[in-house]
């Protein structure tokens, strides 16, 4: 009887007939009871994992310097898995942390009906959680065409502009985005492949003005596991799977290859590299900011700096010793002119340095993002391209 009962619980491969077994009366019922118990155990493990994730995220929120009880914080929710997980966990932490949580959704109007469906999905979830929803809209395609920039830049500027608007109006104090450790690794790797310096290795910053990123210590798959445990649906943006996009290829092909063939901890190591680089970049950034205030003259929509001050910041004569500070100073100037520092790679910085050393008066150098550099005798002038 015991042997027959044991074999009755074996799972046989799909497509293969299981053998006929004659079980004693009551064995089927007992087998179902065991199945129910196993299912309950699995469900409990899922709930335990979900509770542990909520505990970890709440603890991470509480450790941040910007945290305080009563904080009004909005979760930026696109409808995708990561942002839905952020919203659910932020909602779960409300009572424990004493925060005022809300949802923030920005409709880019890029995917027609799908964009509107995303908005409706987020609205329904926010309502079910008892959270206020703040919605912004923009025709990002028209904005990109008008400003002569790509869709990604236009979308980011419109979206973050909306976040700043909410903060300036006092609707929220901070907006939390759902960038994960995987996003950090992808960003650092993308910068390395493009060519970058220490600022690029720093990757995604945990806080930038009114925007915070509390999930940078968490893996993307853990967030999906959390959602599955909560039986929570999410929306998928088809553009994230578009293999024509570099970021999508990196996510689907390159990083999995590196994890499988070289180091299963590559994502964690890239994220750790960004932490170390950020510490050093912050020091260099502070020095460059002081240099910029002292040596850069703003006027007429442009920024002017002497060639000597650019090539030898702080009077450092050695090219290699001054290289990091010089690169950050160029980044600082370009940011002042166009607010799009990210488009300037290490190769572009080298081009500016070469132009400063060899360029003739009246000559121009074009940089990406609509920035030109004009040589005026012993100075360089950075200005927006007309």
What kind of feature is each model-predicted range?
Residues 5-15, 19-82, 102-106, 138-140, ...:
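AMP-forming adenylation/ATP pyrophosphatase catalytic core
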Residues 23, 28, 32-255:
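Core alpha/beta nucleotide-donor-binding catalytic domains of modification enzymes
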Residues 94, 129, 262, 334-338:
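A broad structural signal for alpha-helix termini and local helix breaks/kinks
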Residues 237-241, 264-267, 342-343:
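Short, surface-exposed loop/turn segments at secondary-structure junctions
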Residues 256-266:
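Conserved anion/nucleotide-ligand pocket segment
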